[in-house]
């Protein structure tokens, strides 16, 4: 059993079986999964109470890979020194961890002697981070998606042969997706009425999954069966293209509805994270008397960096539609994070509960 992180609600105990764990480990180790082999030295940069403790460690043991555990310190310096000491070539974690690592390496003009590949999940990885790791340090960044209820792995973004012929810019667009479902997992997107939506890369709907390691019940039956006609509702909003590559557009609880149009908080955050002065950013919706909701962006600046509200809002011009640009920038000392490193937007909303939009 593993408890959910409680990022969007109360933690629930997810029940696993020996069979589901073995099947998940086998599928995760496949070439179109996490590509785990005995040649790897793997560092999962997550606490052992995290669901990844049910994933990579078992795939590593199954294939004979070296498994390196992080210590209590999750800062960039500690992670870098551990990677170098143990010759880690494959690591996995959430974007906040890799941002700290990247900042440490950049600030100290360091290089990676062994790291070849990192898998990023938990939340969307900013394009600027993928580009920096790949272009500057030669480290492949692989997007993956999953959740505690999926043991956790559901999709991995491994490029197909035809993608290797694309330009770097076009390849980045593919790498930004969460990828194709691994062997054993089925997925689909549906509209509000539960009708299947097409895999055209345009239609956007609620993401549902099923498979032999997908949760069918919670500890003590909390909340009843989570399944709907055999499918697990993930709480994510996504698109799926013709090649089966899925892209999370937002959590259903985080998407912002403004004037009848949906605004992806992830897209707004990714643009802010591309600014050289921004260390971390979180987008939330604020009630608006006319438009229902409007986005604002909470920003934590990099150490010794300086940027104004006006400069950040100007940074969005040409990168987002005018109606998608945040109405305001709120500078914060820190953005609330959970024990697994994921942003806790519920706490951020609580901190900003008395905030009022300009000109309202």
Give the predicted meaning of each segment.
Residues 91, 211, 216-217, 237-324, ...:
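AMP-binding/adenylate-forming catalytic core of the ANL superfamily
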């Amino acid at each position: 059993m593993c408890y959910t992180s409680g990022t969007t609600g109360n933690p629930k105990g997810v029940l696993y079986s020996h069979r589901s764990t073995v099947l998940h480990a086998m599928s995760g180790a496949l070439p179109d999964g996490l590509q785990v082999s005995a040649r790897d030295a793997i560092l999962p940069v997550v606490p052992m109470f995290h669901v990844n403790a049910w994933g990579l460690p078992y795939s590593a043991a199954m294939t004979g890979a070296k498994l390196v555990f992080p210590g209590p310190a999750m800062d960039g310096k500690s992670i870098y020194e551990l990677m170098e000491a143990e010759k880690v070539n494959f690591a996995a974690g959430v974007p906040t961890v890799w941002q700290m690592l990247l900042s440490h390496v950049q600030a100290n003009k360091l290089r990676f002697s062994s790291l070849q590949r990192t898998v990023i999940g938990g939340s969307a990885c900013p394009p600027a981070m993928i580009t920096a790791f790949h272009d500057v340090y030669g480290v492949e960044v692989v997007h993956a998606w999953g959740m505690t209820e999926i043991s956790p792995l559901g999709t991995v973004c491994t490029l197909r042969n035809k993608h290797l012929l694309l330009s770097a810019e076009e390849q980045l667009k593919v790498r930004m997706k969460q990828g194709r479902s691994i062997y054993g997992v089925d997925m689909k997107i549906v509209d509000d009425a539960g009708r299947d939506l097409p895999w055209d890369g345009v239609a956007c709907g609620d993401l549902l999954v099923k498979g032999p390691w997908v949760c069918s019940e919670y500890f003590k039956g909390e909340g009843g069966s989570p399944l709907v006609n055999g499918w697990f509702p993930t709480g994510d909003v996504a698109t799926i293209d013709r090649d089966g590559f899925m892209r999370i557009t937002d959590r259903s609880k985080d998407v912002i509805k403004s004037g009848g149009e949906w605004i992806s908080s992830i897209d707004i955050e990714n643009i802010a994270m591309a600014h050289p002065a921004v260390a971390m950013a979180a987008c939330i919706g604020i009630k608006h008397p006319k438009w229902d909701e409007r986005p604002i962006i909470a920003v934590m600046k990099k150490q010794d960096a300086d940027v104004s509200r006006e400069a950040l809002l100007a940074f969005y011009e040409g990168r987002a539609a005018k109606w998608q640009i945040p109405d305001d920038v709120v500078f914060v000392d820190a953005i609330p994070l959970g024990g697994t490193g994921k942003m806790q937007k519920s706490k951020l909303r609580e901190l900003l509960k008395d905030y009022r939009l300009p000109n309202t």
